[in-house]
């Protein structure tokens, strides 16, 4: 720095997410085992196993709090068991975020409704453990609006005007 100049704080360039170094089978294991753990927790009302499998940052939620968070799934009777046999489609391939967490988003294209997911994992003791989860059910594709009401047909016409009884002679 030159004498008489003021120090200037420079912004550090933001670190961009980078692809995760994980094979497809590893990704499928993480996604399926996580969603099945949630499915079992929702079906039994017991969230302790889901919590115990997760990272410490997720474990700040006790089992009762997790039951509150996922109460809507239980009310709707959400069944996630189909994730065992359907391959997920990824809208965001697994990537390492600047904070070191791995995130992936996508859906299982099941019919009549697809299962959408957003999962975040933390590296703990050499394993990826659940840090955040969002699961929702949505339509499998764009939904068309309802049919418009049937309009009354205008009276049929001919070149000479409205069609009616033949003229009297």
Residue spans for each PLM region:
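Exposed beta-sheet edge and beta->alpha loop/turn motif
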Residues: 89-169
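Short solvent-exposed beta->alpha transition segments
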Residues: 21-36, 40-101
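Juxtamembrane and targeting peptides
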Residues: 1-42, 138, 145-167
């Amino acid at each position: 720095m030159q004498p008489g100049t003021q120090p200037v704080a420079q912004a550090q360039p933001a670190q961009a997410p980078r692809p995760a170094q994980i094979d497809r089978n590893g990704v499928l294991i993480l996604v399926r085992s996580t969603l099945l753990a949630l499915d079992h927790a929702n079906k039994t009302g017991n969230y302790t196993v889901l919590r115990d499998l997760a990272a410490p940052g997720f474990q700040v939620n006790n089992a009762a709090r997790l039951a509150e968070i996922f109460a809507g799934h239980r009310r709707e009777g959400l069944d996630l068991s189909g994730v065992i046999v359907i391959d997920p489609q990824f809208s965001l391939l697994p990537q390492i975020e600047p904070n070191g967490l791995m995130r992936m988003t996508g859906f299982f294209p099941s019919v009549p409704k697809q299962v959408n997911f957003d999962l975040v994992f933390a590296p703990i003791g050499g394993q990826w453990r659940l840090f955040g989860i969002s699961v929702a059910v949505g339509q499998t594709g764009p939904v068309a609006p309802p049919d418009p009401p049937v309009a009354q047909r205008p009276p049929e016409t001919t070149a000479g005007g409205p069609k009616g009884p033949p003229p009297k002679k």
